[in-house]
């Protein structure tokens, strides 16, 4: 699942539309997931009033937040809620839309670290990376519980999984962490930098 429902306030424009490799980031991420062998792909598209996303291929569902104004955690819940009835004992691989360095090889390393009933979250220098992680679909009810209590931290959701055994850690090397370089402001976006000139 691709998390693409954010408001991109720091960027000043919708990150799903930013171009990488001559295509919007959203379509790039779809291609990476398909190349990694994933067949059931959805996009967490945020609230109903979110501006339009780049057109996606037919059959890619756009999932809407069921909990208002609770950030990425609402997208995590939407994805798990979509996947759980289809694959109750499976997993949901979640990636943020604004990870232009993400690769098939990196995703395959992540996928290799899951186990029955247990997902995997990368960690780098002590900080979890929950927006490029795999969650067991059985955690859907826990995601609902967090949001019903207005707990919007995906970090806290992951920590609960680590404490109770349904998540594991992948300690990233410096090289592996480069795949999680993201674009948060115009200064992070190479095209924007080129337009600014030297």
Name these PLM-found stretches:
Residues 1-179, 187-197:
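Nucleotide and nucleotide-moiety/phosphate-recognizing core
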């Amino acid at each position: 699942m691709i998390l693409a429902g954010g408001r991109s306030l720091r960027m000043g424009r919708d990150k799903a539309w930013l171009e990488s490799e001559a295509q919007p980031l959203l379509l790039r991420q779809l291609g990476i997931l398909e190349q990694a062998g994933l067949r059931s792909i959805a996009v967490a598209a945020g609230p109903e009033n979110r501006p339009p996303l780049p057109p996606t291929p037919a059959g890619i569902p756009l999932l809407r937040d069921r909990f208002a104004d609770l950030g990425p955690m609402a997208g995590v819940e939407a994805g798990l809620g979509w996947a759980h009835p289809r694959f109750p004992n499976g997993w949901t691989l979640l990636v943020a839309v604004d990870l232009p360095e993400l690769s098939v090889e990196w995703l395959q390393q992540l996928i290799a670290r899951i186990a029955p009933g247990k997902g995997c979250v990368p960690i780098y220098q002590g900080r979890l990376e929950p927006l490029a992680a795999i969650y067991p679909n059985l955690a859907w009810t826990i995601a609902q519980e967090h949001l019903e209590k207005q707990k919007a931290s995906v970090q806290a959701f992951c920590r609960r999984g680590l404490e109770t055994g349904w998540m594991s850690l992948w300690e990233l090397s410096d090289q592996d962490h480069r795949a999680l370089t993201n674009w948060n402001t115009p200064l992070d976006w190479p095209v924007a930098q080129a337009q600014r000139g030297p």
